[in-house]
Amino acid sequence: MSFFDIFKKKKSKDVAKDRLMMMLAYERANTKIENLDEMKKDLINVVKKYLNVKDVHIKSNSNQDIETLEVEIILNK
């Protein structure tokens, strides 16, 4: 990363990726954050912006030692 990269506007895909990584980190740490639902909505909006989708669902699961964040994207035909 160069000094001038600081002033470049991030693409929405990069912002969505960063938010997803942040959500995963908080979910793994079992830390509740107040804006997690807002971040999930933002992620859904970015997916809908770039894909022709019918619906998008995001849910988190925890089984024993494994925690997952599941993203289900239903595409239009």
From Swiss-Prot:
SUPFAM superfamilies, per the entry: Cell division protein MinE topological specificity domain
InterPro entries (alphabetical): MinE, MinE_sf
Top-level taxonomic group: Bacteria
Keywords on record: Cell cycle, Cell division
Keyword Transit peptide: no
One Gene Ontology term from the biological process aspect of the record: cell division
Sequence similarity: Belongs to the MinE family.
Described purpose of this protein according to its UniProt entry: Prevents the cell division inhibition by proteins MinC and MinD at internal division sites while permitting inhibition at polar sites. This ensures cell division at the proper site by restricting the formation of a division septum at the midpoint of the long axis of the cell.
Protein name per Swiss-Prot or TrEMBL: Cell division topological specificity factor
Source organism per UniProt: Nautilia profundicola (strain ATCC BAA-1463 / DSM 18972 / AmH)
